């Protein structure tokens, strides 16, 4: 009688640890998806802003340079013409709109992966979802450590995790995260 009871107890402990392991794996997969959604959302906003600002600047300086043909020529008009040319070349070479669309596509792919986290029932589903997240990640745009830190902070907020693990990103680093990407945040307790 004691031997059968110990077998049942061992089986119950194994299934409990399997459930805990599955829950932890699902939690990690949700973390990865939320982190990447936040990161791609940030990039989408940034590249959309850059695209809009370049278009506005080209329109303003272009109008100013075109008006110089009718008003008269001076150094200021020539400088505006050079600025328009430089901004036009910048938008053609960097193509902010394409990067914005790519970041939005990645965000949507990660969102659909996040939606499937709840349907994970066993370890094979976890492996399949992990492979899907890995495949999606192959197409990610490069990001800096400050962008990653802000995405980590957003994922911590979304999942209700302990705020002591949030990265301390200063205002200057937050504003210049795409211009000066090599800055490093401070992690840990504040």
Residue ranges and their predicted role:
Residues 2-60, 90-190:
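Conserved non-transmembrane functional hotspots
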Residues 58-66, 84-88:
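Hydrophobic, membrane-inserted alpha-helices
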Residues 64-83, 91-92:
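Hydrophobic alpha-helical transmembrane segments
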Residues 70-75, 98:
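Membrane-interface helix caps and helix-loop-helix hairpins in membrane proteins
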């Amino acid at each position: 009688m004691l031997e059968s009871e110990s077998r049942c107890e061992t089986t119950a402990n194994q299934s409990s640890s399997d459930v805990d392991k599955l829950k932890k794996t699902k939690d990690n997969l949700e973390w990865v998806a939320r982190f990447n959604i936040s990161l791609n959302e940030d990039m989408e906003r940034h590249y959309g802003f850059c695209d809009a600002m370049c278009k506005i600047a080209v329109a303003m300086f272009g109008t100013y340079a075109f008006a110089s043909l009718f008003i008269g020529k001076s150094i200021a008009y020539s400088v505006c013409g050079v600025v328009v040319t430089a901004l036009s070349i910048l938008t053609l070479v960097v193509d902010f709109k394409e990067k914005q669309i790519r970041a939005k596509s990645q965000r949507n792919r990660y969102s659909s992966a996040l939606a499937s986290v709840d349907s994970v029932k066993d370890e094979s589903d976890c492996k399949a979802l992990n492979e899907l997240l890995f495949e999606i990640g192959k197409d990610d745009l490069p990001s800096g450590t400050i962008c990653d830190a802000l995405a980590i902070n957003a994922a911590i907020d979304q999942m209700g995790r302990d705020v002591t693990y949030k990265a301390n990103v200063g205002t200057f680093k937050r504003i210049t995260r795409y211009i000066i990407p090599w800055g490093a945040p401070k992690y840990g307790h504040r």
